[in-house]
Amino acid sequence: MHINFSYPYIIPSSHINLSLTLISLEEWALITFNGKDAVKYLQDQLACDVTSLKNNEYTFTVHCNTKGKVYSNVYFLHYQDGFALITRKSVYANELNIFKKYAIFYTVNINFHQNKILLGIAGLQVKDILSNIFTTIPNRLCPVIHTMDTTILYLHQPADRFLLITTNNIQNLILKKLTKYKIQTNNSKQWLALDIAAGYPIIDQINSELLLPQALNIEALGGISFNKGCYLGQEAIARTKYHNMNKKELCFLSGKANRIPTASEKLEIKINNNWRYTGIVLAACKLKNNIWIQVVLNRNLAIDSILRVRGDITSVFHLCPLNYL
């Protein structure tokens, strides 16, 4: 399967009214690690505690530079005879080079897998229907399973959905078995919309090495260990926590505008009768009736704050709650 495989794009839907949908994750990439030093190496690289991660678990975490700024956020899990992380396609090449740079003193193999298929499945009755394809599926108590040449991750935000690391043959089997259901396909913009609503950060290359993990809510998502010892960026990340230095947080906005803001641009916020630049956009997605934005803003903004896209005086956006905050 070609690295750029994707299903045709259709306008994404909210999780509230999403029909059963099989989603190609062409904007994500899979990097694997194995070898006798893989645990020690990854413990020195990532912000999570690699040693405490169980085989049937995954975690959100970050890979940072020495200043604690995030190269990228990742899904991290046990995979085959080692570990895997799923990261954004736009950053994987740079991340791969950095991982290999720091690996010269370790016995560890690091590989990018373009022959694996990354799929998402979400929407109406997704649990029941996936259970008709696989003999067992993951849940909140066991969020990762490995079966039929496939690894399946369960995500419960913003609604039940699953991420699959699989093969072309299994993908074809899934499509064949789903023909009797009213299933639609979509590309990764649908998964992006779900991640925005869930509050799972999206770091593409343009925003790489700009933000501390706390500003991305990674601590709230359980992706930072403060007990594991040294790793890249650890001093800055710990100092930010213990000196209460973080003044930013990841937010979810919903509203309307004449254009979709791009990653790295600023928004405007209304303060009294004036508009001021604020925040940094991480991702945005057009839905059928509105636009969703993921943005890093100052912490503790009033819930009734009004924001808009720069240069679009008719646009209006409001904060939406994130369930883990």
UniProtKB/Swiss-Prot annotation:
Predominant cellular place of this UniProt entry's protein: cytoplasm
GO biological process: iron-sulfur cluster assembly; RNA modification; tRNA processing
Any one Gene Ontology cellular component term annotated for this protein: cytoplasm
Source domain of life: Bacteria
Any one GO molecular function term: folic acid binding
Subcellular location: Cytoplasm
Recorded family membership: Belongs to the tRNA-modifying YgfZ family.
Name recorded for this polypeptide: tRNA-modifying protein YgfZ
Phylogenetic lineage: Bacteria, Pseudomonadati, Pseudomonadota, Gammaproteobacteria, Candidatus Palibaumannia
